[in-house]
Design a protein with these regions (language model features):
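Amphipathic alpha-helical protein-interaction segments
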Residues: 2-194, 212-220, 256
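General N-terminal targeting signals
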Residues: 63, 103, 149, 189, ...
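Short secondary-structure transition/capping segments
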Residues: 95-97, 118, 160-164, 201-203, ...
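Intrinsically disordered, low-complexity Ser/Thr-rich linker and spacer segments
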Residues: 104-110, 204, 305-307
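Non-catalytic propeptide/linker segments at domain boundaries
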Residues: 193-207
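Interaction modules related to DNA damage response and DNA replication/repair
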Residues: 209-308
Length: 308
């Protein structure tokens, strides 16, 4: 009789071995790269920062030492980086290779999940150089207009709503461009300039920057991996400040205020695991008029210090 295998998770709920859900994570990495390449290629020019971003994706990839497919991918990425330009032929060759790996490598593209991974990769690509040109905005609008199912759900619906407002008068001013860039970076977790990482940092959906939130009697829910200590340590801080710790965001709960604290490092699959689901739930409840706040780890640490 064969024993059923179980994934070994650390205390943050993250898999301790790469074998856990390997095919799904491999497909995610490939779909994300497809989106990144589309995003970077949108303006036909590879800037210095975009080159750094693409190289960071390659160097941070957890599969590169053991997987032949990723060795091939890395070689083609290096060819693209060599002259600083992504030509149409290079893009077609690269995208075809990535699609072949998905098709013939017995990998699932995830359906809707795969579409979102591609979108997040695209958002990372167009925001890698910390600017948005008209060509990139136009291509984003076209991408969102292609899939009604995609834009009916978070996070694409949030981008579509903001983009429609910006494009309503046919003019994108500097303020609107900056606003859209901030939203894109928040959703994709883009933090290359701050961290040097192509992925892995949390998307920041903070709903408040208020530095004086009284935690006494409040219900606090944590998600993500924290740079300032384990989740258990964060929960102990919350309890010491008179808050109630909740494991999930529950609609039926009689919530006055629930503070969802985002850890600074997210799971490889954050948008499809409890991390992303909790964010989606809170944003949905806020649209329904519920008084729920989301704060990031930086603000959480300031609150605990302040209230101590």
């Amino acid at each position: 009789m064969t024993a059923k295998s179980t994934a070994v998770l650390d205390h943050h709920g993250q898999p301790q071995t790469l074998a856990f859900n390997y095919k799904r994570n491999k497909a995610k990495a490939i779909l994300t790269l497809k989106g990144i390449l589309d995003g970077i290629h949108a303006d036909k020019h590879l800037s210095e920062l975009e080159e750094v971003y693409l190289r960071a994706w390659k160097d941070n990839d957890v599969f590169n030492l053991t997987d032949g497919d990723f060795i091939d991918i890395h070689e083609q990425v290096e060819d693209i980086l060599e002259d600083g330009v992504i030509t149409t032929s290079e893009l077609i060759d690269m995208q075809q290779m990535l699609q072949d790996i998905l098709n013939y490598g017995d990998l699932e593209d995830g359906g809707y999940e795969g579409t979102v991974n591609h979108l997040l990769g695209f958002l990372s690509g167009i925001s890698a150089d910390d600017t948005l040109c008209d060509a990139e905005i136009e291509k984003l609008a076209k991408l969102l207009s292609k899939d009604k199912h995609l834009v009916s759900k978070w996070p694409a619906n949030a981008i579509k709503k903001r983009l429609d407002m910006i494009l309503e008068d046919g003019i994108v001013d500097d303020s609107e461009r900056c606003d859209l860039l901030s939203l894109i970076k928040a959703i994709s977790g883009q933090s290359l300039l701050e961290t040097g990482l192509a992925y892995g940092m949390s998307a920041d959906f903070s709903t408040t920057q208020e530095g004086r939130i009284c935690l006494k009697g409040k219900q606090v829910c944590f998600t993500g991996k924290f740079l300032s200590g384990s989740r258990k340590i964060q929960e102990q801080k919350a309890l010491s400040l008179g808050a109630q710790v909740k494991g999930n965001v529950v609609k039926g709960l009689d919530i006055l205020v629930l503070v969802l604290v985002l850890g600074a490092v997210a799971s490889r699959d954050w948008q499809f695991t409890s991390y992303g689901r909790k964010i989606e739930s809170v944003l949905t409840y806020r649209e329904e008029g519920r008084k729920i706040e989301i704060i990031n780890e930086e603000l959480w640490n300031a609150l605990t210090v302040c209230d101590d």
